Curated annotation (Swiss-Prot):
Gene3D superfamilies: 2.40.30.130, Threonyl-trna Synthetase, Chain A, domain 2. The modification Phosphoserine is found at S174. Keywords: Cytoplasm, Metal-binding, Phosphoprotein, Protein biosynthesis, Zinc. It comes from Rattus norvegicus (Rat). GO terms for cellular component: cytoplasm. It holds the Pfam family tRNA_SAD. Its cofactor is Zn(2+). This is Alanyl-tRNA editing protein Aarsd1. Functions in trans to edit the amino acid moiety from incorrectly charged tRNA(Ala). Binds 1 zinc ion per subunit. It comes from the Eukaryota. Zn(2+) binds at H109, H113, C209, H213. InterPro entries: Ala-tRNA-synth_IIc_core (IPR018165), Alanyl-tRNA_Editing_Enzymes (IPR051335), Thr/Ala-tRNA-synth_IIc_edit (IPR018163), Transl_B-barrel_sf (IPR009000), tRNA_SAD (IPR012947).
Length: 412
């Protein structure tokens, strides 16, 4: 038996009875990539308004007696609703669906059916899978490439069918019905039982599907195909938005356009050319800056070499600079008798360091320098360099190096 959400995708609330409520746990994504386990209950209802994940469509969100439902999954012919508050079996409850989320899923899913059918009808492009993402939807097509002309033709055709206000209907067929053979589909779940649910766009397509759909293509409003990307081997991914997502995308795009107009001091039609000019100017400045930095590194190396303080341990810190700057200095000095400790970056924060000198000394001291600076590094052939998080401890490194040199001199 189909759930109420499948029989009437436009229903927003209804009353039903709790069948069971059992302790359960739910693993969520939490913050970032860290998994979080929530303790709660799996609630089974006589019928449900909340769609359980399936057919490429995410599950619904909503409430049962104002208690938030955090996940809905299908288990055979029933739906499990995860809540963090128990509900009494046998009690009547009011179920409400998060309509904004539901209607968005209806628009995207019906949009996918329409694009899949039109791509096949016009160009024989078969759909092998699809994904209803949080920001965009992806249809995987069984073709190594899709031309811009094909994309434009598909988009024009699907939007014409939306303007034609074609009805969308749902019906159920028995497994032995000969018509099942004429229906588009990618197979049924292993635990499927009962009749086959078929979604039909009048005159366009009939497709096996368990998801929630609009009852008329006019509810899709519009479909925008953003383009295609290279997919898996010999596959192409077609990226699209339907309905309210197109409006939100236009709002974001218009906001970005206004911001760029203000920053670049030119109209939207000149944005690309203005950015190209900025990129070229930046590349030239970076090239000039690099040449100046190299000249400065050579001059700094000669200054250090001719300094009265030359010998033993020589240190230098500059706020501006990079790894190449330090290596040029080390190359110019080329001394294996002196320990050279160079750093660049924030004096009290993070930065880069380089230790150069006798191979044996550098191999011994390099890891210890990284440890003092609370950083990481690696080295070979008389050099050890890396990243540091505590440049404020440079004086401790200098003391460490001087102690080492003094000890070596005493032993000699």
């Amino acid at each position: 038996m189909a759930f109420l959400c499948q029989r009437d995708s436009y229903a927003r609330e209804f009353t039903t009875t709790v069948v069971s409520c059992c302790p359960a746990e739910l693993q969520t994504d939490g913050n970032g990539s860290k998994k979080e386990v929530l303790s709660g209950f799996q609630v089974v209802l006589e019928d449900t308004l909340l769609f359980p994940e399936g057919g490429g469509q995410p599950d619904d969100r909503g409430t049962i007696n104002d208690i938030s439902v955090l996940r809905v999954t299908r288990r055979g012919a029933q739906a499990d609703h995860f809540t963090q508050t128990p509900l009494s079996p046998g009690s009547q409850v009011q179920v409400r669906v998060d309509w904004e989320r539901r209607f968005d899923h209806m628009q995207q899913h019906s949009g996918q059916h329409l694009i899949t059918a039109v791509a096949d009808l016009l160009f024989g492009l078969k759909t092998t899978s699809w994904e209803l993402g949080k920001l965009r939807c992806v249809i995987e097509l069984d073709s190594p490439s899709v031309t811009a002309e094909q994309v434009a033709a598909i988009e024009q055709s699907v939007n014409q069918k939306i303007r034609d206000r074609l009805p969308v209907s749902v019906r159920e067929l028995s497994l032995d019905d000969p018509e099942v053979e004429q229906v588009r589909g990618r197979g049924l779940p292993d635990d499927h039982a009962g009749p086959i649910r078929v979604v039909t766009i009048e005159g366009v397509d009939s497709n096996m599907c368990c998801g929630t759909h609009v009852n008329n293509l006019s509810d899709l409003q519009v479909i925008k195909i953003l383009g295609t990307e290279k997919g898996k081997k010999n596959k192409s991914n077609l990226i699209f938005l339907a309905g309210n997502r197109v409006l939100k995308w236009m709002e974001r795009s218009h906001g970005s356009e206004k911001a760029l107009t203000s920053l670049l001091k030119c109209g939207a039609e000149d944005h690309v050319e203005a950015v190209k000019k900025l990129q070229n100017a930046t590349k030239l400045l970076q090239k000039n800056n690099l040449n100046l930095l190299r000249d400065l590194a050579v001059h700094t190396a000669h200054t250090l070499r001719s300094s009265p303080a030359w010998g033993g341990v020589v240190t230098l810190h500059r706020k501006e600079g990079d790894s190449e700057f330090m290596n040029i200095i080390a190359n110019e000095i080329g001394s294996e008798e002196t320990l050279l400790f160079l750093t660049v970056g924030d004096e009290k924060g993070a930065g880069l360091f380089l230790l150069a000198g006798p191979t044996e000394a550098v191999e011994t001291l390099g890891p210890r320098v990284a440890e003092v600076l609370e950083g990481k590094g690696a080295g070979k052939k008389g050099r050890f360099q890396g990243k540091a998080t505590k440049m404020s401890r440079r004086a401790e490194v200098q003391a460490l190096l001087q102690d080492y040199v003094s000890t070596q001199s005493a032993e000699e």
